[in-house]
Amino acid sequence: GPGLGQTAWSEQMIQRVFWEAEKRDVPVIMDADALNLLTQLKLSSKLPKNLILTPHPGEAARLLNTNISNVESDRFGSAAKLQKKFNATVVLKGSGSIVCYKGNGGQKWGLCNSGNPGMATGGMGDVLTGIIAGILAQGLSLKDAAEAGVDLHSKAADLASLETGEVGLTPSDVISELRSLLRYD
């Protein structure tokens, strides 16, 4: 998603990714432009079975054909609607990021209590997507990778903001703090 664009080439690329993901039984994480394409192309019938969506409230509103204030006024309900509509694990980013997934007995939720307003800047979602992808590559489930990724991302942002402050927090600051959270010394 990050940097994908929204062209005819992008549409072909995303359809190819879906096809390859199903053929190889590998997960797909969709963010940014990929989510916008998902809204425009009505691809929900062709989605891979191992899917994580990481929308911010604006992207969630487009995916649900509603407005941002409706998403923000019922974040749990919005995450649940996205999970059901796309049969995906959903990370609804924002203050109190929510992970919604299909578990035994129905939908389940995780709520992140870490993070700060400095995370509302370009590139932070790209970092989150990369963290989740790295965790998935280690063999964790979609739910576990999404929850661990959100937790690491927000805790790293909190650590970085102690040093730099929330204003001007950059994705690079967050990446630097990830190292300290992942050390096993």
Where are these regions (language model features)?
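A general alpha-helix detector
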Residues: 59, 78, 130-131, 156
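N-terminal loops that bind phosphate or other acidic moieties
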Residues: 43-44, 48, 104-107, 119, ...
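Glycine-rich phosphate/dinucleotide-binding loop and adjoining beta-alpha-beta core of small-molecule
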Residues: 1-114
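Charged C-terminal helix
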Residues: 155-185
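Short beta-alpha connecting loops at secondary-structure transitions
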Residues: 63-64, 112-119, 129, 133, ...
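Short, small-residue alpha-helix embedded
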Residues: 62, 121-152
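Short, charged, surface-exposed loops that flank catalytic or proteolytic processing sites
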Residues: 68-75, 139-147, 165-169
